[in-house]
Structures are given as structure tokens and as C-alpha cells.
Design a protein with these regions (language model features):
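Cytosolic, membrane-interface loops and tails of multi-pass inner-membrane proteins
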Residues: 4-21, 83-104, 200-228, 279-283
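Membrane-embedded alpha-helical segments that form the functional core of polytopic membrane enzymes
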Residues: 40-48, 52-85, 93, 117-121, ...
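Interfacial loop-to-transmembrane junctions
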Residues: 268-303
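Transmembrane alpha-helical segments that form the membrane-embedded catalytic/substrate-channel core
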Residues: 71-79, 141-149, 190-207, 240, ...
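Multi-pass membrane catalytic core of lipid/isoprenoid biosynthesis enzymes
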Residues: 85, 93-134, 223-247
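Juxtamembrane boundary at the C-terminal end of a transmembrane helix
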Residues: 306-318
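Intramembrane alpha-helical segments
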Residues: 106-176
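Small-residue-rich segments of transmembrane alpha-helices in multi-pass membrane proteins
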Residues: 40-43, 97-98, 118, 160-176, ...
Length: 318
């Protein structure tokens, strides 16, 4: 027979376990890692825009901007999962997502998503400026309303989805500056171009899953890998001049240009290595090349943005 203390300990342990599971479900619903990436890119845009104005970026405007962006991104993720719950349930990689597995109800997810997108956008419009709130709402609508349904119709969804996917650093810039300017567009271009090798690697790794769910990713429609590799290489090469655009505009200096060139050549090297999938017959090795490119992409972008911030306006410090 268990003592009261032991029973209490077991009850507390079960409650703690349920709480962890609950937290993990909502972290997955709101795509916490994607939301963090959006916040990081938005922070870079705000930081560079603030220094362009000659003011410190470390103010309430930064917190308001990042908080609003995080809320809208989380809401968009919830709406995306609501729309894709059936296809998610058909893929091994996503079958355990909370809405696909039925742990979070459809209505609950939709209400959370719509509320977060609406109130987050309104918050940004009020606390920063109307342009920033509008761009953030456009990002959410583009991602949920256009990109998500197009994934089942055409491989062009990846290209179209790259537009809302690249807006966060521009949103950070407009929050600091109140207008769309060429440096903000350059930040948009960096994120736009970066996405293609990144997503092609993901699509190649999980092409069987996408095929079973009826999602028209490039590796599904062109299974020989030629188009996947060609697109990846094209954008990886393009990444080199695009990453230097901020220096041409006077936002960053020569030290950044050196760092950006080295980083971009490294990104290109992993993309060239990814091209081995064209001749690789071992599916495990083919997947490994894609996984290595994916890892390189998620290391490359934060390092590139950090280099921008360290060398902003020609400085070599924050």
C-alpha cells in the first residue's frame, strides 16, 4: 500500500508530465522554432534601421516589434496547421502534430490563430506604424491564404511562399524607419534567396511524405532531382551578390563583406555537395547530403545577420 506522500508525489509527477506535454503541443502548434527565426530576422531589420536613423535600437520599439511579430507568426502557424491537419496526418514527419493527432481541436486552433493574427497586427499598427502592421498582416495572409493551399496545386508555391517568408526583416526595418527603403529591400532579398536551397533540402529529405500527402513539391513532381539541384545551385550562387547588397547601400562595411563572402561560399559549397544526389543510388546517403545542406542553411543565416549587425554603418561592435 502506497503512503499518502508517495501518492502525492505520483500525482504531482503526472501533473508535471501533462503540463510538459501541453507546453510541447502549443510550441508545435505555434511552430516555436519558425517563430524564433522570424523574431531574429525582424530584430536584425529593426537594429539596422535604428542605427540608420542614428538612434539606439535597444528601446521599447524593439520589444513591441518583436512581440507583435511573434504573436502574428504564432497565429499564422496555428492557422496553417488547421488547414493542413489532414495532409499532416498522412505524413510520418507531421502525423504527431497536435491538430493532426486530435490533441488540439480545429475550432480551438482556428480561434487562437485568427485572434493572434488580428490582435498582433493591430498592436504593431498602433505601437509602431500603420505600414508595419499592414506588412505583417500581408505576411500572414500570404502564408496562410495563398501559399498553404497552393502547395497542393503547384510547385510554384515554394516561389510564391518565399515572398511572405522574406518579409520579416523588412518589417523590422519599417518598424524602425517608418518607410520602405532600399536597405530594407536588400534584407528582404537576403531572406528570399536564402530560402530556396533551405527548402529544397527539406523537400528532398521528405519527398516520399509529401508525395503521399499530395503536396506538389519540386522533388515530388521531378523525382530525378535535376530541377531540385538546379534551383538550389542558382539561388546559392545568387546569394553571394545579394548578401553584399547592404554594403553597396552603405548599411554595412568591408569587414561584413569579407565575412558574407566567406559564409556565402560555404553555403554554396554545401549546395554543390547536395548536387551529388543526382548520381547517388543509396537513399540514406542522398538524404544525408540534403540534411547537411539543411544544417548549413540554418547556421548560415544567423551568422550572416550577426555579421551585419556587428558591422552596421561601418561599426565593428554593437
Amino acid at each position: 500500500m502506497q503512503s499518502p506522500a508517495t501518492t502525492q508525489d505520483l500525482t504531482g509527477s503526472a501533473a508535471a508530465s501533462r503540463f510538459r506535454e501541453w507546453m510541447m503541443d502549443y510550441a508545435e502548434l505555434f511552430k516555436a522554432r519558425v517563430t524564433l527565426l522570424v523574431v531574429i530576422t525582424g530584430a536584425a531589420g529593426f537594429y539596422l534601421g535604428s542605427l540608420r536613423s542614428g538612434i539606439s535600437p535597444f528601446n521599447m520599439g524593439l520589444l513591441n516589434t518583436l512581440g507583435g511579430m511573434a504573436v502574428v507568426t504564432a497565429g499564422s502557424a496555428a492557422l496553417n496547421e488547421a488547414l493542413e491537419r489532414r495532409s499532416d496526418a498522412q505524413m510520418r514527419r507531421t502525423a504527431r502534430r497536435p491538430m493532426a493527432a486530435g490533441r488540439i481541436g480545429l475550432l480551438h486552433g482556428l480561434l487562437l490563430g485568427f485572434a493572434a493574427v488580428f490582435f498582433g497586427s493591430m498592436f504593431l499598427a498602433h505601437e509602431t506604424n500603420l505600414l508595419t502592421g499592414t506588412l505583417t498582416l500581408i505576411t500572414a495572409v500570404g502564408y496562410v491564404g495563398i501559399y498553404t493551399p497552393l502547395k497542393r496545386m503547384t510547385t510554384l508555391a515554394t516561389f510564391i511562399g518565399a515572398f511572405p517568408g522574406a518579409l520579416p526583416p523588412l518589417i523590422g526595418w519599417t518598424a524602425a524607419r517608418g518607410m520602405i527603403e532600399w536597405p530594407g529591400v536588400a534584407l528582404f532579398a537576403v531572406l528570399f534567396v536564402w530560402q530556396f536551397p533551405h527548402f529544397m533540402a527539406i523537400a528532398w529529405m521528405y519527398r516520399e511524405d509529401y508525395a503521399s500527402a499530395g503536396i506538389k513539391m519540386t522533388p515530388v513532381v521531378s523525382p530525378n532531382g535535376l530541377t531540385t539541384v538546379a534551383q538550389s545551385l542558382f539561388y546559392a550562387v545568387l546569394m553571394i551578390p545579394v548578401s553584399l547588397w547592404t554594403t553597396w547601400l552603405g548599411v554595412t562595411g568591408i569587414p561584413y563583406s569579407i565575412a558574407a563572402t566567406i559564409l556565402s561560399l560555404g553555403y554554396l559549397w554545401y549546395t554543390v555537395r547536395f548536387a551529388r544526389i543526382l548520381k547517388e543510388t543509396d537513399p540514406l546517403k542522398s538524404r544525408a547530403y540534403a540534411r547537411d545542406l539543411l544544417k548549413a542553411s540554418v547556421i548560415y543565416l544567423p551568422l550572416l545577420l550577426a555579421a551585419m549587425m556587428l558591422n552596421a554603418q561601418g561599426r565593428i561592435f554593437f
